[in-house]
Curated annotation (Swiss-Prot):
Superkingdom as given in the UniProt entry: Bacteria
Keywords on record: NAD, Oxidoreductase
Binding annotation for NAD(+): A3, L4, H5, F6, G7, A8, G9, N10, I11, G12, R13, G14
A Gene Ontology term for the protein's cellular component: cytosol
Full protein name: Mannitol-1-phosphate 5-dehydrogenase
Length: 373
């Protein structure tokens, strides 16, 4: 039972590949990094270490790999035989692997069902990949593929820190993980994936992750940067920053509980668990890395402004947004662009243009007040 996984990077090996291996699949990685492909085929296994006290580890194997750029015939053969295809290549790379997957689907000569799951840090990753794949197929081919191939969306969550290992195949991951899959998107029988959660509606889980993990991480980083702190761990250990982060997550939590019916006590435990992840001393994450791409993260539907617009009194979120607007790290192109926009249009103009917060909205005034404090 073959699982073909696109992306032999840290998340592919340390998260998705490991879970598929534990679920009984023969995992084959597809990647264009020839060094990684050769190493996986030479060693046929790799080590996954948990970033926690004691640093327990396990061997994942046997596994194999192919170069999806040069071994296209082998790729198409595997696609014909695979029971499951997954990806962890990054949102921007999905469109690059779509032509090869389209050709593999075009050549499939089996009536067996196949499901393709994009495990990316984006909303609707599988739907996006499907759209990209279908752009390389004729209408008749699309109809044929749609009869046997499913594209269930999923939400994934696991922190994979910067790696410092002599063994290039070894990967450290945090103990916590979450892989939630929309069961309604499958063709045929739902596959066995140990550790995954299958749900009828993915939206509550996507928003819970985005408005808790991503929001909390961003507020920690932006406020921490303003305080001159270097790492997420240092930032969340600062009492005032911790208060702001916790308050922001209580604000988003109120919206999530009311909108999706999460139990209040369970969601409070979820918030506690998420803040505990930021406190993990075995994960070193610079605030400048977590805070990068402020233009995207200040978007109207993203982790800061998105929930703030849905809440009556988003004071802590407004503080996080104000800190994000002040993010001036010269090593990040978006931060440089953001500061240039502020210089040109002022905070009010940027709130309207970048954040979609118009001058008549109460949130606009709340954020400006925070910026003037």
């Amino acid at each position: 039972m073959i699982a073909l996984h696109f992306g032999a990077g840290n998340i592919g090996r340390g998260f998705i590949g490991a879970l598929l291996h534990h679920s009984g699949y023969d995992v084959v990685f597809a990647d264009v990094n020839e060094t990684m492909v050769s190493l996986l085929n030479e060693k046929k296994e790799y080590t996954v270490e948990l970033a926690e006290e004691g640093r327990s580890s396990e061997i994942i194997g046997p596994v194999s790999a192919i170069n999806s750029g040069s071994q296209t015939e082998e790729l198409y053969r595997l696609m014909n035989e695979a029971a499951l295809i997954t990806t962890a290549v990054g949102p921007n790379v999905l469109k690059l692997i779509a032509p090869s997957i389209a050709e593999g689907l075009r050549r499939r000569n089996t009536a067996n069902t196949l499901n393709i799951i994009a495990c990316e840090n984006m909303i609707g990753g599988s739907s996006f990949l499907k759209k990209e794949i279908y752009s390389h197929l004729t209408e008749a081919e699309q109809k044929s593929v749609s009869e046997t191939v499913g594209f269930p969306n999923s939400a994934v969550d696991r922190i994979v820190p910067i790696q410092h290992h002599e063994d290039p195949l070894k990967v450290s991951v945090e103990p916590f993980f979450e892989w939630v899959i929309d069961e309604s998107g499958f063709k045929g029988k739902t596959p066995v994936i140990n550790g995954a959660l299958f749900v009828d509606d993915l939206t509550p889980y996507i928003e819970r992750k985005l408005f808790t993990v991503n929001t909390g991480h961003a507020v920690t980083a932006y406020v921490g940067y303003q305080r001159g702190l270097k790492t997420v761990k240092e930032a969340i250990d600062h009492p005032e920053i911790r208060r702001v982060v916790h308050s922001a997550l209580l604000e988003t939590g109120d919206y999530l509980v009311k909108s999706y019916g999460f139990k209040q006590t369970e969601h409070e435990q979820y918030i506690k668990k998420i803040i505990g992840r930021f406190e993990n001393p075995f994960i070193s994450d610079d605030v400048t890395r977590v805070a990068r791409s402020p233009l995207r993260k200040l978007g109207e539907n993203d982790r800061l402004v998105g929930p703030a617009k849905k809440i009556k009194e988003p004071n802590a979120l407004a503080e996080g947004i104000a800190a994000a607007l002040r993010f001036d790290f010269t090593g990040d192109p978006e931060a440089v662009e953001l500061q240039a926009l502020i210089e040109e249009k002022g905070y009010s103009g940027v709130l309207q243009e970048v954040c979609g917060i118009q001058s008549h909205e109460p949130l606009h005034a709340i954020i400006l007040k925070k910026l003037n404090q």
